[in-house]
Amino acid sequence: MTPGEIKRLYFIIRVFLSYGLDELIPKVKLTLPLRIGRFGFFWIKNQHKGKELGERLRLALQELGPVWIKFGQMLSTRRDLFPLAIADQLSLLQDKVASFDGKLARRYIEESLGGPLEQWFDDFDEKALASASIAQVHTAKLKENGKEVVLKVIRPDILPVIKADVKLMYRIANWVPLLPDGRRLRPKEVVREYEKTLIDELNLLRESANAIQLRRNFENSSMLYVPEVYADYCRENVMVMERIYGIPVSDIAALKAQGTNMKILAERGVKVFFTQVFRDSFFHADMHPGNIFVSYEHPEDPLYIGIDCGIVGSLNKEDKRYLAENFIAFFNRDYRKVAELHVDSGWVPADTNVEDFEFAIRTVCEPIFEKPLAEISFGHVLLNLFNTARRFNMEVQPQLVLLQKTLLYIEGLGRQLYPQLDLWKTAKPFLEDWVHSQVGIPAITQALKEKAPYWAEKMPEIPDLIYGALRQHKFLQSNIEQLSEQLKQQRNKQRKSQYLLGIGATLILCGSLFFISASNRMAIAFMSAGALSWIIGWYKSGKS
């Protein structure tokens, strides 16, 4: 380890011990050196003894800084790996940090765009509008038309910090599987997933492309508005987009004061999510309250505004079908169907015992129906199914983990806005309509429509392809006949050689008998003839 890594590691150890997180170390023989090593830091005391473990962990990550805050936020979505009390505390982590110098931000943007800001923008505000761990946002106006925009710029010092901390995380992850039940936590997978998320968020060209696609998907929609991206000014570390004005969706008091129809707003959140997943196969996977606003206009017919498209997810057609049918089967309590769908989709191994799997699902999920249907959480249904399936060697599906995380956000948000929200009643017609649209005449017609351009392009080639196939067939047929004849001749040769070998063996045996009976002349004759037959047979066998 480098001196810098050692210094950083000491800081992490000091923070963790000052929050009493050494109690997370399992009391097993393997961790004895660690527990003894704890006494080597005897001067660092637990300064937060009155707080619960989950809260102490959250506060420690908050103190360690932005990289660890985002790591904690990601861990809060992995409720299949951690106790709910800890996951709930981690979900409270706020990705808010002090902004860096606006003059530095200006210089950094100018370097990326290749000229002074005044060439493209007026009224650039060096005071950040908002600041987070990865980037911060400044306001300005486009010089060409006076439109208000925001400029998002990556922190210039963030990459070395990310690399150093992720490297330390990997070192820790290499050690965790040695602990009892450590493999179940899949530490390397968790760190790898986090690293990928960070790398994606560091590339604002990726976020720009995501925002452009999401805006196109909801163009002229009455449910969701996505601000316009000005792609000409976007670079890997700078993004320029339309400035929006709205009420943060978490500000319930302001929404009610505005006269917002909370029931419609909550239901639209669910519809927006399922539209993204099942219609578009492209969903915003970071829909926490900080990224969602509500337009000031038409509060009786509320419109969501979505920002920050750095993390998105997608499902292929098969995943969508299995997911929709899983939900429908679950709410119909058809656990056999749920088990079969998991096997058919390849989410669990093909040799899984369906009866055992069905029983395990029933045992875990049946108690859920003790609640009224309106109170059942889709996200926790998925979580229970994934946890059960993992016992049957279900491979982690990253796209489903993202989906489950987003679904939990949407559910929590919907019930915060309108506690009486019946998620199943809102989603069921959507799911059933989508499943029905995938079968029957409409589905066939749609498939033909989608393939029409392909077949129109290939149609002129069909006569040549048929002619080539017929010629190839004739050539293959001729070769097959020749091979068949050669095999026949070879089999005949083999039969002859085997016949001669048999005669040779018989003659040698007879010669041996004559030799025993003292008839030397007959013995020599028979044995010579037998040897000759054997040699000829062996020779022919070798040639064939």
Curated annotation (Swiss-Prot):
<dbReference type="GO" id="GO:0005524">
    <property type="term" value="F:ATP binding"/>
</dbReference>
<dbReference type="InterPro" id="IPR050154">
    <property type="entry name" value="UbiB_kinase"/>
</dbReference>
<dbReference type="InterPro" id="IPR010232">
    <property type="entry name" value="UbiB"/>
</dbReference>
<keyword id="KW-1133">Transmembrane helix</keyword>
<dbReference type="GO" id="GO:0006744">
    <property type="term" value="P:ubiquinone biosynthetic process"/>
</dbReference>
<dbReference type="InterPro" id="IPR011009">
    <property type="entry name" value="Kinase-like_dom_sf"/>
</dbReference>
<keyword id="KW-0831">Ubiquinone biosynthesis</keyword>
<keyword id="KW-0808">Transferase</keyword>
<feature type="transmembrane region" description="Helical">
    <location>
        <begin position="522"/>
        <end position="542"/>
    </location>
</feature>
<comment type="similarity">
    <text>Belongs to the ABC1 family. UbiB subfamily.</text>
</comment>
<keyword id="KW-1003">Cell membrane</keyword>
<protein>
    <recommendedName>
        <fullName>Probable protein kinase UbiB</fullName>
        <ecNumber>2.7.-.-</ecNumber>
    </recommendedName>
</protein>
<keyword id="KW-0547">Nucleotide-binding</keyword>
<feature type="domain" description="Protein kinase">
    <location>
        <begin position="123"/>
        <end position="500"/>
    </location>
</feature>
<keyword id="KW-0472">Membrane</keyword>
<feature type="binding site">
    <location>
        <position position="152"/>
    </location>
    <ligand>
        <name>ATP</name>
    </ligand>
</feature>
<dbReference type="InterPro" id="IPR004147">
    <property type="entry name" value="ABC1_dom"/>
</dbReference>
<comment type="function">
    <text>Is probably a protein kinase regulator of UbiI activity which is involved in aerobic coenzyme Q (ubiquinone) biosynthesis. Required for the expression of 2'-N-acetyltransferase.</text>
</comment>
<keyword id="KW-0418">Kinase</keyword>
<dbReference type="InterPro" id="IPR045308">
    <property type="entry name" value="UbiB_bact"/>
</dbReference>
<keyword id="KW-0997">Cell inner membrane</keyword>
<dbReference type="Pfam" id="PF03109">
    <property type="entry name" value="ABC1"/>
</dbReference>
<comment type="pathway">
    <text>Cofactor biosynthesis; ubiquinone biosynthesis [regulation].</text>
</comment>
<dbReference type="GO" id="GO:0010795">
    <property type="term" value="P:regulation of ubiquinone biosynthetic process"/>
</dbReference>
<keyword id="KW-0067">ATP-binding</keyword>
<dbReference type="GO" id="GO:0004672">
    <property type="term" value="F:protein kinase activity"/>
</dbReference>
<dbReference type="GO" id="GO:0005886">
    <property type="term" value="C:plasma membrane"/>
</dbReference>
<keyword id="KW-0812">Transmembrane</keyword>
<feature type="binding site">
    <location>
        <begin position="129"/>
        <end position="137"/>
    </location>
    <ligand>
        <name>ATP</name>
    </ligand>
</feature>
<feature type="active site" description="Proton acceptor">
    <location>
        <position position="286"/>
    </location>
</feature>
<feature type="transmembrane region" description="Helical">
    <location>
        <begin position="499"/>
        <end position="519"/>
    </location>
</feature>
